[in-house]
């Protein structure tokens, strides 16, 4: 039986370089994106190139043109570029699994941003496993704190670069990261445990509802949906989208319910090129290129 193979996203930072070191025998191809946004970008690219060569792992480097016009939300635009490259590599190597190096500090950072924004999420933080853009995503480092990863890098003599912009409060995520950096180990642990407890409650409610609503999920009739209490409607719409590998926030689900109620609009945009529509009183997805 062939070994499980992955595409791996490697930036050159300690997290992803350790991922490359520990999983290189299972990696079909590494993808590195050079955004040309900072002076050390080429340094990180060369570091990834040299380490992939040393470990004998195929590498695809995507260089974003220097004259690229970046939108206000750079991080969202950069993420889209990354995943487009992951998809291309996955198609080329006929692999549907993606390895990413998010760790527990990333988890609490994401959860805090969600809570600070008062977003009603169906999951807080970052999932260890999930599906995005048609790929099965695995994040094996969620169980490790950042300082543990740095210690492992030293232990395994893993080279890495530090993105100096992470310390600059130029993005909301960076500001949250700096705030969390001042927390004690006990404060981080307490926050993490609290978020996990919230996720368990949400998951239990969702599991219970899905057991009762299998028939609706198979035939998502909007008239039947409206017979459920509003909290259940939100969970059902979320379940419908998750079965189609589309993950959205609680706020977006509320907007979807608003779209469903009057039947005034033809389509609701979920993500790039993916739209929600109502056909014969049933929810359906449209994919437009």
Curated annotation (Swiss-Prot):
It catalyses: cytidine(34) in tRNA(Ile2) + L-lysine + ATP = lysidine(34) in tRNA(Ile2) + AMP + diphosphate + H(+). ATP binds at residues 11-16. GO terms for biological process: tRNA modification. GO terms for molecular function: ATP binding; tRNA(Ile)-lysidine synthase activity. Keywords: ATP-binding, Cytoplasm, Ligase, Nucleotide-binding, tRNA processing. The keyword Hydrolase does not apply. Ligates lysine onto the cytidine present at position 34 of the AUA codon-specific tRNA(Ile) that contains the anticodon CAU, in an ATP-dependent manner. Cytidine is converted to lysidine, thus changing the amino acid specificity of the tRNA from methionine to isoleucine. Belongs to the tRNA(Ile)-lysidine synthase family. HAMAP family: tRNA_Ile_lys_synt. This is tRNA(Ile)-lysidine synthase. It comes from Mycoplasma pneumoniae (strain ATCC 29342 / M129 / Subtype 1). The lineage of its organism: Bacteria, Bacillati, Mycoplasmatota, Mycoplasmoidales, Mycoplasmoidaceae. The gene is tilS.
């Amino acid at each position: 039986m062939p070994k499980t193979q992955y595409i791996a996203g490697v930036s050159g930072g300690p997290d992803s370089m350790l991922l490359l070191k520990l999983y290189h025998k299972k990696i079909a191809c590494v993808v590195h994106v050079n955004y040309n946004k900072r002076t050390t970008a080429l340094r990180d690219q060369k570091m990834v190139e040299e380490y992939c060569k040393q470990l004998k792992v195929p590498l695809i480097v995507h260089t974003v043109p220097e004259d690229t016009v970046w939108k206000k939300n750079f991080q969202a635009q950069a993420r889209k570029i990354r995943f487009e490259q992951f998809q291309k590599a996955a198609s080329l190597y006929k692999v549907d699994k993606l390895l990413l190096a998010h760790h527990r500090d990333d988890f609490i950072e994401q959860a805090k941003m969600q809570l600070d924004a008062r977003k009603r999420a169906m999951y807080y933080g970052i999932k260890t496993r999930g599906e995005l853009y048609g790929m099965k995503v695995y994040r094996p480092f969620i169980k490790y704190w950042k300082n543990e990863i740095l210690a492992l890098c030293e232990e395994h003599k893993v080279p890495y670069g530090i993105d100096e912009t992470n310390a600059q409060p130029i993005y909301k995520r960076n500001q949250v990261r700096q705030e969390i950096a001042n927390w004690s180990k006990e404060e981080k642990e307490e926050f993490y445990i609290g978020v996990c407890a919230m996720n368990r409650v949400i998951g239990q409610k969702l599991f219970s509802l899905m057991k009762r609503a299998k028939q609706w999920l198979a035939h998502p009739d909007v008239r039947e949906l409206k017979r459920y209490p509003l909290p259940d409607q939100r969970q059902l719409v979320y379940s419908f989208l998750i079965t189609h590998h589309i993950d959205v926030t609680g706020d977006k689900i509320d907007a979807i319910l608003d779209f469903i109620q009057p039947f005034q609009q033809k389509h609701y945009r979920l993500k790039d090129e993916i739209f929600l529509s109502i056909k014969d009183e049933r929810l359906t997805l449209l994919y437009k290129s």
